[in-house]
């Protein structure tokens, strides 16, 4: 599995590759992708879940039980539950987010899709998101999925990353450049 441009570590990439191949063999790629996206969302929203994932103080079995309880509540597939259990027993939960990113990146690559990571100063309307997706699709010549995050510290505008390319049209960056230019004048 190529990890170039995905920011996925070697450890996470190996686990992601193993899960991808297993899901492919079981013809469960779509279900596994949905389950992993849900897990990623849960980890982003729950500080308690992030503590379980990152805590070196919890035993392997405690981490595995906690993760299994969470996954059972949201009704994810047995494949993902077994995978997360294995990751917990191997003390690798700290890399779970990278494993999820690696799996989803490989699935997108196999489907001829690219993921644009967009950070905007404020939430985009559905119309704005559709226009951005369409513009990126035309510029890149392939299907594009947009991973949108909001960061008010940008002040205005957005930062778009696709693979190793980045377009930064944020007000924060423009102000920083102006500040540096003004320092050079005086």
Swiss-Prot record:
It is a peripheral membrane protein. Coiled coil: none annotated. Gene3D superfamilies: N-terminal domain of the delta subunit of the F1F0-ATP synthase (1.10.520.20). It comes from the Bacteria. PROSITE patterns: ATPASE_DELTA. Pfam families: OSCP. Keywords: ATP synthesis, Cell inner membrane, Cell membrane, CF(1), Hydrogen ion transport, Ion transport, Membrane, Transport. It is found in: Cell inner membrane. One of its GO terms (cellular component) is plasma membrane. One of its GO terms (molecular function) is proton-transporting ATP synthase activity, rotational mechanism. Belongs to the ATPase delta chain family. NCBIfam families: ATP_synt_delta (TIGR01145), PRK05758.2-2 (NF004402), PRK05758.3-2 (NF004406). F(1)F(0) ATP synthase produces ATP from ADP in the presence of a proton or sodium gradient. F-type ATPases consist of two structural domains, F(1) containing the extramembraneous catalytic core and F(0) containing the membrane proton channel, linked together by a central stalk and a peripheral stalk. During catalysis, ATP synthesis in the catalytic domain of F(1) is coupled via a rotary mechanism of the central stalk subunits to proton translocation. This protein is part of the stalk that links CF(0) to CF(1). It either transmits conformational changes from CF(0) to CF(1) or is implicated in proton conduction. F-type ATPases have 2 components, F(1) - the catalytic core - and F(0) - the membrane proton channel. F(1) has five subunits: alpha(3), beta(3), gamma(1), delta(1), epsilon(1). CF(0) has four main subunits: a(1), b(1), b'(1) and c(10-14). The alpha and beta chains form an alternating ring which encloses part of the gamma chain. F(1) is attached to F(0) by a central stalk formed by the gamma and epsilon chains, while a peripheral stalk is formed by the delta, b and b' chains. This is ATP synthase subunit delta. It comes from Rhodospirillum centenum (strain ATCC 51521 / SW).
